[in-house]
Amino acid sequence: MGEPEEVMPGSGAVFTFGKTQFAENIPSKFWFRNDVPTFLSCGDEHTAVVTGNNKLYMFGSNNWGQLGLGSKSTVSKPTCVKALKPEKVKFAACGRNHTLVSTEGGKVYAAGGNNEGQLGLGDTEERSTFHLISFFTSQRKIKQLSAGSNTSAALTEDGELFMWGDNSEGQIGLENVTNVCVPQQVTVGKPISWISCGYYHSAFVTTEGQLYTFGEPECGKLGLPNQLLVNHRMPQPVPGIPGKVVQVACGGGHTVVLTEKAVYTFGLGQFGQLGLGTFLFETSVPKAIEHIKDQKISFIACGENHTALITDMGLMYTFGDGRHGKLGLGLENSTNQFIPTLCSNFLRFIVQLVSCGGCHTLVFATPRLGGTEEMELKEINKSCFSAATSLSLSNLSSGIVLHQTLSARVRRREREKSPDSFQMTRTLPPIDGIPMPPVCFSPSPIPFYMAASNWSGKMTPEKEGLTQPEPDYFRDNMAKGKETDNSSATDSESLGETTDVLNMTHMMSLNSNDKSLKLSPIDKQKKQETIEKLKQHTAHFGNDDSKGCASEEMSKTVKEGKAYKQLLAKGIYMTQAAMTMEAFSDEDIGNDSGQPGPRADTHAEGVQRKIFSCESKHGLYPPDFKAIAKESDGGQSQKDPEAEETVSEKENELAEMAGLQARRQSEENLRNINMFFDDLPNRDVNIEDEESKDFVKDSRRNKQDVIFDSERESIEEPDSYLEGESESQQGTTDGFEQPESVEFSSGEKEDDDEVETDQNLWYSRKFIEQGHKEETEHILSKFMAKYDFKCDHLSEIPEEQEGAEDSEGSGIEEQEVEANENVEVPAGKEEKEIEILSDDLTDRAEDHEFSEDEEPEDMAEELDEDLESKKNVPADVASDNSLKKDETTKQEKRAICEYNENPKGNMHYHAKSSSSEVLNDSESTPNKDVKKSKKIFLFKRMSLMSQKSMQSNNEPLPEIKPIGDQIAFKGNKKDANQNHMGQNHQDTSPPDMERRSKSCTIL
């Protein structure tokens, strides 16, 4: 389909869809030189093609020898059955695991499975080559062959019907036998014109146009009233079908009937194979398909769970189970269709033949000459706008109406078919992540547009793969998906120069992702409570995974430099946090306070941060920051690819400019922030604390990821965000709240749940990550500002508030780090350091959880007083929340002033004093608060620590003997102190990044 029309011969080609062995799950086509197909038949997993030269070609599964090629090996290419070359093959019929072939001379051959005698050879031994059924002679000319699960049928031109094989459900019309190994005639006293065998039921049409059915009676597939089902083993006429029946087709659990004027269906339609819409899943009463009532149908075909129709104009409609793309609707659409859907790919072709199997479809079509455009417009309009008519209330009058079981995907399909689809998709985005207009995501002003559009663009070619792969596939290929998807997504998003960086980032972040995946178990255990709360804000999709993966490695590294890192985390966090806060305090606060909750839903980190901002908005941010919020909103709202590009570049410039302005603004911001946090209610702080934990998770993951690239981290976070978004959309469609859906999408759940929406995760990650990229950079500045004020506040602000801010800060921190990482961070060192820091943080968080009061003291003993004071400050800060707002305000002011004068020494000293104060308070405060705040604080610190500890605590580093690459941080002590987030990255990062972090921290 993707190749130009000229490549195909004028005689046409055979198109394959679904799992055909010829091209797994990928639409493909083939044709014969100097020959054309005249008959197609699809079995459960194998296919037969008869050509005009009376040759038989077979391919597909062959575990029972059903291809008749003399072996049982799978054949992926159409292969001529040479044994039948002397015979002129006319018809073929493929069952579940056997094949029937008839010749012009009236002979019938069979091959394959024979456990029920379906080969008609008088025994039940399977055959791997075609054997002649002696019952049929040249006296009987075969008109039609049909094969079911384990049944066979042959209809002669004289109207005689012969059936054999399995009769456990009466599917061969014999009353008192379970199976027969030789053909038996089935008659109702009238000549028969058409026969069809389903999996466990059969139907035929008499020359008078009367339909008879027999076999398995469940699900209404026989179309008979209950009183007639007693005799289901014998052919009985089906009432309720007006007009003369021309054809009948039996599927796995449904039956399709073609009359001279309409198409009727009955039976089971849970996949949409009845074509009666999403409100009727089962009916025993034949119902006309209203959607194609204006079309003249010339041929019908049924697979196990899908149906195909050919019109007299050579157009094809398909509906039912869309898995593997067997409906032929394109790579981007492998979803179930509940009403006949026009195969637009065949508008330029005339469909001649179609056959449906268990998991695939074959179509023979010839190029359409002229009139293609007019027909295209005409048919598309009809198919697009007549969908609603098929859902008329008349369909609800009878049958089983299943509203609750209606899947979100189904509802989405319904909406896609109706004119209101776009409005509905706004509130209920598609589950599968099928590309939808950006309009559907309009509710979220964050770079969602870009992510959505790019996502759709990327998803279109790869979506099918996504839907098909199993959950593990996503996990295994997460890194690869992020690399390729992110790089391609960045290209599509017009990130420009950042594209290469993103690619590098993805390469680098593959390891971090794996590690992060390892980390999740520890963090999950520690933060189960937080996660539960986060479910509402579920923006940490990647965080849990990253934590889980890194947890194992972290536990090891944590043991080595646990105390050191903890102290560093606190001290560094204190110092760098204040510095960072100074630079970005305005933007950070503005974004947090200004961003609405809905936005938070759009991005993973954005969700958390935004949620914080919404909650903290009331208490955390005063009106003075509204302008800042607007600015930050504007910055983040730049979701377009260009916006992101410019944002990322601007972020670098802003970071540098922030250095100059940071000092002035940071001082004012710090003061304002101090006032803010003093005024902040504990409730907001608590909420933020838990969220901050989540952010800490994010920051931890970001730390690991930071090594690779800040952009990548931002991308990963957007990933989770997209994931959340798509899942939230799914959840909404399913009736769940977006937060829940987001949570499911967060982590591997989505991937586990669902395969189809699971690759969406990658794509969504790409786009979201890109979207986050901008936010991350914006947030970097914000985060820097927050941390600048936070460092001062760490000692002064209550732990809960601090933790809340830290959580926000950590989110920002992560983004900051990501931005800094974007600059150019040695993946190896930063990775290791970040991992170690994150590991230490997790361990520290655990230690803090168990003994926070003791831990500050122990840490103080182990490390320098500065580190000790810092460490104590975080733990104490949690307890200080309400008690020491005044003290924190004063101390923060002092700390800010001192820090501005001498960031390292003063900050550490101030941290000590504040930590001592906080320690007193923390001892009085409950362990839970301290634990939460410490956890959050530790993780954030770790991110800050990894950078700050390397930076501000340069002296203690040699004493502590930094683990792995931590020593590398020594080189950039100044930079580290200046930019706790960015330093780890800055050590390897270009001077620009150093400037950014420095400008932010130099305050």
From Swiss-Prot:
Polar residues bias: start-end ranges: 486-495, 978-989
Compartment(s) of residence: Golgi apparatus; Cell projection, Cilium; Cytoplasm, Cytoskeleton, Cilium basal body; Cytoplasm, Cytoskeleton, Microtubule organizing center, Centrosome
Residues bearing the modification Phosphoserine: 418, 520
One GO-annotated biological process of the protein: cilium assembly
Composition-biased stretches (Acidic residues): 716-726, 797-821, 849-867
SUPFAM superfamilies found in the cross-reference section: RCC1/BLIP-II (SSF50985)
Pfam families referenced in this protein's UniProt entry, alphabetically: RCC1, WD40_RLD
Subunit architecture: Interacts with PDE6D. Interacts with RPGRIP1. Interacts with RPGRIP1L. PDE6D, RPGRIP1 and RPGRIP1L may compete for the same binding sites. Interacts with NPM1. Interacts with SMC1A and SMC3. Interacts with CEP290. Interacts with WHRN. Interacts with SPATA7. Interacts with RAB37 and RAB8A (in GDP-bound forms); functions as GEF for RAB37 and RAB8A.
UniProt cross-references to PANTHER family, sorted A to Z: BTK-BINDING PROTEIN-RELATED (PTHR22872), X-LINKED RETINITIS PIGMENTOSA GTPASE REGULATOR (PTHR22872:SF9)
Name of the protein: X-linked retinitis pigmentosa GTPase regulator
Organism per entry: Canis lupus familiaris (Dog)
